[in-house]
Amino acid sequence: MPVGFSQGLSFDRKRANWSRTGHRPLAWCAWYPANDDAVEIAPAPSWFKQTPVAPNAPMKKSTDPRSLVLLSHGSGGLAIGLEWLGHRLAQAGFVALGIDHHGHTGSEPYRAEGFLCLWERAADLTALLDANDWREVLGGAIENHAYVAGFSAGAYTAMLLVGACVAYSQFEPDNPQKSPIRGPREFPDLADQIPSLLQDEIFLESWNRRRDSFRDDRLKAALAIAPGRSVLGFSKESLEEITAPVQVVGGDADVIAPAQECCTWLHENVRSSSLEIMGGGVGHYTFLPEPTPQGLKAAPAVFTDVAGLVRENVHNHVAQMAIAFFSTAR
């Protein structure tokens, strides 16, 4: 089945961007089943491999509305970085809709606010689900409810949408669960930015929302891929109240977000969850795309796996898990 690909820009008119110069941007991209005669072309060369798609092709008609999966990237990442999952979901009949989270994405300059206020990412997906412009672009019938899959910080986002609530932000000084780092690789001094940012009105508004509920009952199930240490700041009471199905998956060799510390903890506190820790040397970045030679040269730490591990096989396994999970969660 050919896979169509479209992208666009929506706005959340209820929230300002971090500079308060306009509405918060919601840059999105989507993979979906296209008509059988759609012509697929190879995307422009980049740091990672991408499967050919049919740009802006008409969506293949179906008897019933198509199921929707929202995708949430990791810290400093891109929606297109989950192409490996989105494309496979589309081949299975789903519509996969990803977003670049403002201030926390590689598609624009990094903002400390975006890296600290992770709860705004959940509001991004709720706002995108509220919007109609991407539906008009894609055409076809798409369900109003959705599923959500996220990697790393995206897993945190997914959990917020099914009912997790923040007790402590990972880097706030009062957090009793002290982080072993001061920030992620993209923003290593992140914790040190908090005192000055608290003088900024728009940051303070968001910071004061951190313990709000971002649950969206339209989200029927969540796939949490390699959740990071930020999930340890969720309130256990909120996790115990989650009823939506949750699938947690991690890697046995993840040193960024150790599976026994993060995946297992999350699973033990969410009664409706299942857990799989993949063996064979699966690391945190194994869940990122396969590299091109250009990407491997530019970012070997991100694109190099242990000897004998085939990243494509890991992606195939997780995608099949996602397809089966979301198909039975309907």
Model-derived features: positions:
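Catalytic nucleophile-loop/oxyanion-hole region of alpha/beta-hydrolase
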Residues: G76-R88, T105-D130
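Gly/Ala-rich beta-loop-alpha elbow adjacent to hydrolase catalytic centers
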Residues: G150-G154, A158
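Short beta-strand/loop motif that positions the catalytic acidic residue
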Residues: I242, V248-G250
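Short alpha-helix in the alpha/beta-hydrolase fold that links the catalytic acid
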Residues: S235-E237, A244, P258-S272
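Domain-level recognition of soluble alpha/beta enzyme cores
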Residues: M1-L70, Q91
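Alpha/beta-hydrolase active-site loop
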Residues: E113-N144, M159-C165, S169-S196, N208-S213
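Catalytic active-site module of serine/aspartate enzymes centered on a nucleophile-bearing elbow/loop
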Residues: G279-R330
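Active-site glycine-rich loops that stabilize anionic/oxyanionic intermediates
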Residues: R66, H73-L78
